[in-house]
Each structure stands twice: as C-alpha cells, then as structure tokens.
Amino acid sequence: MKKILFLSLFLMVCTILSAQKRVKVACVGNSITYGYTLPNPATDSYPSQLQQLLGETYEVGNFGKSGATLLNKGHRPYMQQEEFKKAIAFAGDIVVIHLGINDTDPRDWPNYRDSFVKDYLALIDSFRVANPKCHIIIARLTPIADRHPRFESGTRDWHGEIQQSIETIAKYAGVQLMDFHEPLYPYPYLLPDAVHPNVEGAGILAKTVYSAITGDFGGLHLSELYTDNMVLQHG
C-alpha cells in the first residue's frame, strides 16, 4: 500500500514539474490568428498547427480576435477585447503578435495612423509587464490579394505603410521581427477570400513561427531567441 501511495505521489510530482517546465507561447492577433473561415479553428488555425509542430513541451494559446485592430481608436481595439485579458493572464514566455490587417479599414488608418507606433509599443509593454522575461515576436502582415474590394482604393497603400511601421517598431522596441508576408505572397490561392489563409496557408504561418521560435531554418541560422539565453525545448 505504501509503495502504491509513494508511486502515486511521485507521478503527481512529475506531472506538476513537467507542466511547470512547458514553454508557454501566446499567439495574439485577429481573425487570421483565430482561424476564421477554416473548417475547424481548434485544429486548423496556425496556433493549433504550431502546437503540433512544437510538441508537448510547449503550450500554445490562441488569443486571436476576429476584426481586432491594433489601433486603440480603431473600430475594434484588441486591447479592449476579452482575448487581450486572457493573453495577459496567460503570461506567455513567448508572445507572437500579428495585428494590423484590420487597421487598413478606411475608418481606421486614414484617421489614426499617427497612433499606430505608440499603440503597438503599449501592447508590447503590456506583455512585458505580465512576464518581464517574455520574448516577443512581431510579424510583418500577411498579404492582401489584389482581388480585395478595397485593394486599389487605399488598402494596398495603407497595408504597405503599416508594414513599414511594424519594421520600425521592431527596431525601436528591441523585439524579434518575423515575416508573414513573403511566405504567402507567391500563393494567392491560399487566401480564398483575399485575406484569410486556408488550412495550407495557416500551416505555412505555423511553420514560420516554428522556425522563429526554434531556430530551425533548415540549417541556415539560429533564431534570435538564442541570444536571450533562453533554453528552448523540442517536442
């Protein structure tokens, strides 16, 4: 009986320690992160596919909110959504942010573009307060295909301006910059509605994040995470 009790306690302690050692990855974003238009976001979204790639030593949280803007005066500010509160409470060791697509809306960018950098820095600071040791990765925007109804009326140009702002933010905030644009750009068919990736497209995003986190670029170079003295675990 004592042996059984000891074994049960030992297994419980091992389970707790194992859970404590999992690297938490918070995926922050809009409908592209959430998995909108996908058959089953719970398994098909890029954060879900990322979980499969990283394995059990990581815990990936999907905190995507459909329609969310980065701009705090936008039509649906991310920092005012429940998903933001949950992401902060999650206190990820790694925070992956992909926001800005919805800010190309004519209600938003033309009126509040001057606040974009300030608002993005505030978002980054919020996650650093929640976990001062977190590593933050921000993504260049996914493409918007030229068949989008507002593509030529402003979306194309505003999308480009936001890309430039994101690159500036990465340098100023000292965070890792990751590219969600180039991997999808040659394949517009992966964006059936001109904005949201299909399952294959979401898989490409998952692999892009996986490479940014683990440094597995097919032997080309290591992720910036290694410069932060962070020990990463492979599943």
Model-derived features with residue positions:
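Alpha-helical scaffolding segments of alpha/beta enzyme cores, especially the outer helices
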Residues: S115-K118, A122-V129, E161-T168
